[in-house]
């Protein structure tokens, strides 16, 4: 057995471990298929018995034969039902368990995994690939058990009747083994490429569905059609290769069996001269019944190989290490003191570090603003606080304790994150505010959070209020409304540390007035990290850190940095000239004044 065959056997063996919890049901299905297969073998024996009886007994003495034949048919039917029904129960349970395990693993995987793998492939694995495994566990397994028993039963009968003649089947076994091994290897490789192409098509489709406005606005329809056409053509080519391999394999197998049966018939005419007519006909009947289960086993092998290829990709996901969570320290509510000591970080596969020797401290309740050009490392810093990525060097301390020492869930309980790209779910407004661990919040608490975030201003206009469905990712809401729901979620969480990552940069002036007013309540008595491009919104921060190429190049208050006439002063001057003082939202000025006070 070569390495590929061994790997395939190990994968299928691992797949069958999912059957173990349902071994009782599986045993019943095996019993049913044993009944089915037994009747196939007994049918050949019955033919022998009928012919011999016709030669030795009167017709009146054969009245039991129709009853015996009917009994075999009934047992055959009962066996078929029991085998199919209970194996179907096992297979649906296995697929359900595997699909849930894959989904649960997605919830445990680190952010770096999602960065490295596109969503289309990940979705295809939990839909299409699990479906391929279903075929391997259900139809193919059913065929292997049922037809395998039938083939074994017929071979036992043949060897019992005339073992010398039956050695013909032993002679062709090596040829069949080599053929099946070659075809299995080829089928598995092609199946994997077919599954990858389905993932690619899913990815392209998800992109055009999610970005249809951009596609239409920039005339990308033809480009997207070409992308999908190329992907679909590749899928078609691989699918045809798969079909061709299966189509050639079956006739070759039948040809080998036909040669063996022809030789067997020729030999039987000479070596079974002393046998009765019944023995001769019964033997040939069993021999000619044998190709059907062997052909079925050959076809089932195709489904098995496709299932193994699919299972391999699923097990790759399951074998991925989850987020590192070795910390044990827990606290009900931290004070909110954040300190960064000589922090450095480089993304996987990147040549340049994203952060270099970052050191600063945020006291409880302070507002720390991070500003600078895009790519300066501001968002990276926020991601490290949440432990979306493990930092390479240095320390991040929360209340004097290294964040890696905290239990991961407990650490994130202390943080509320609001991004520029708000994530909302295809659910009600209330369920989007009270999401995840916040689901236990009362109706009044949800309404209060929405009020404090100035979201009730638009929620009240809907007939169903907080129970209004907002569509996929909040498609029925404006940008400002979506942002206010994100702030309401942060308010409801009531975490001691708030991270605002470009929370207002994409909003119009009117929406920003609402958001800035809501931010005053959100940031009250919380340690806040504010990442902002609009410098007018962070003038009242306690400390402003100016970042450039992963380093802190300036730090101080707004007045101090303006007085330095350095990087911050130039950025501020550029924005002021570009937008003018009249474009600054009144609420932003109020926020600045309130923060300074």
Where are the regions a protein language model picked out?
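Hydrophobic alpha-helical transmembrane bundles that constitute the permease/transmembrane domains
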Residues: 34-42, 73-81, 133-136, 140-152, ...
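Helix-loop-helix
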Residues: 57-58, 157-171, 244-312, 317-318
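ABC-type nucleotide-binding domain
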Residues: 333-597
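A short amphipathic helical element positioned immediately N-terminal to and/or at the very start
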Residues: 8-21, 122
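Transmembrane helices of ABC transporter permease
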Residues: 21, 25-35, 69-72, 139-193, ...
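Short intracellular "coupling" helices and adjacent cytoplasmic loop segments at the cytosolic face
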Residues: 2-5, 92, 100-124, 128-130, ...
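An intracellular "coupling" helix at the cytosolic face of ABC transporter transmembrane type-1 domains
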Residues: 21, 111-112, 128-137, 141, ...
């Amino acid at each position: 057995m070569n390495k590929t065959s061994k790997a395939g056997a190990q994968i299928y063996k691992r797949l069958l471990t999912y059957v173990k919890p349902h071994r009782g049901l599986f045993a019943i299905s095996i019993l049913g298929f044993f009944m089915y297969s037994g009747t196939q073998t007994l049918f050949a024996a019955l033919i022998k018995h009928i012919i011999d009886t016709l030669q030795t007994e009167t017709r009146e003495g054969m009245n039991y034969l129709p009853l015996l034949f009917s009994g075999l048919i009934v047992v055959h039917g009962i066996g078929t039902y029991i085998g199919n029904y209970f194996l179907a129960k096992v297979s649906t349970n296995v697929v359900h368990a595997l699909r849930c395990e894959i989904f649960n693993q997605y919830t445990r995987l680190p952010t770096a995994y999602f960065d490295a793998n596109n969503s289309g492939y990940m979705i295809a694995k939990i839909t299409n690939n699990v479906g391929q495994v279903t075929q391997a566990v259900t139809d193919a397994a059913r065929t292997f058990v049922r037809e395998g028993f039938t083939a074994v039963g017929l071979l036992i009968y043949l060897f019992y009747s005339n073992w010398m003649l039956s050695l013909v089947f032993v002679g062709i076994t090596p040829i069949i083994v080599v053929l099946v091994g070659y075809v299995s290897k080829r089928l598995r490789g092609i199946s994997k490429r077919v599954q990858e192409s389905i993932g690619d098509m899913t990815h392209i489709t998800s992109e055009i569905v999610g970005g249809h406005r951009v596609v239409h606005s920039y005339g990308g329809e033809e480009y997207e059609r070409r992308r999908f056409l190329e992907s679909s053509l590749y899928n078609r080519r691989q699918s045809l290769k798969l079909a061709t391999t299966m189509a050639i394999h079956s006739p070759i197998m039948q040809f080998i069996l036909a040669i063996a049966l022809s030789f067997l018939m020729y030999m039987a005419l000479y070596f079974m001269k002393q046998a009765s007519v019944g023995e001769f006909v019964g033997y040939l009947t069993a021999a000619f019944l044998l190709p059907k289960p062997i052909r079925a086993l050959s076809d089932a092998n195709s489904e098995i190989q496709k299932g193994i290829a699919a299972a391999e990709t699923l097990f790759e996901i399951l074998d991925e290490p989850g987020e590192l969570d070795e910390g044990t320290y827990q606290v009900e509510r931290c004070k909110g003191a954040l300190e960064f000591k000589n922090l450095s970080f480089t993304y996987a596969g990147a040549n340049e570090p994203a952060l270099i020797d970052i050191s600063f401290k945020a006291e409880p309740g302070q507002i720390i603003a991070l500003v600078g050009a895009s790519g300066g490392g501001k968002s990276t810093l926020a991601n490290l606080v949440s432990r979306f990525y493990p930092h390479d060097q240095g320390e991040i301390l929360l209340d004097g304790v290294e964040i890696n020492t905290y239990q991961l869930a407990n650490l994130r309980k202390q943080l509320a994150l609001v991004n520029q790209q708000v994530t909302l779910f295809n659910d009600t407004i209330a369920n989007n505010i009270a999401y995840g661990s916040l689901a236990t919040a009362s109706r009044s608490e949800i309404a209060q959070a929405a009020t404090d975030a100035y979201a009730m201003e638009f929620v009240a206009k809907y007939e169903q209020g907080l129970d209004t469905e907002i569509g996929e990712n909040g498609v029925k809401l404006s940008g400002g409304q979506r942002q206010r729901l994100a702030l309401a979620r942060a308010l409801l969480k009531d975490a001691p540390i708030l991270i605002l990552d470009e929370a207002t940069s994409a909003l119009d002036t009117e929406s920003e007035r609402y958001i800035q007013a809501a931010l005053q309540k959100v940031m009250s008595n919380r340690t806040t990290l504010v990442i902002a491009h609009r410098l007018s919104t962070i003038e009242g921060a306690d400390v402003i850190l100016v970042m450039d190429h992963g380093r802190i190049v300036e730090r101080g208050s707004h007045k101090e940095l303006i007085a330095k006439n350095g990087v911050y002063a130039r950025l501020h001057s550029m924005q002021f000239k570009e937008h003018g003082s009249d474009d600054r939202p009144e609420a932003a000025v109020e926020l600045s004044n309130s923060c300074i006070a």
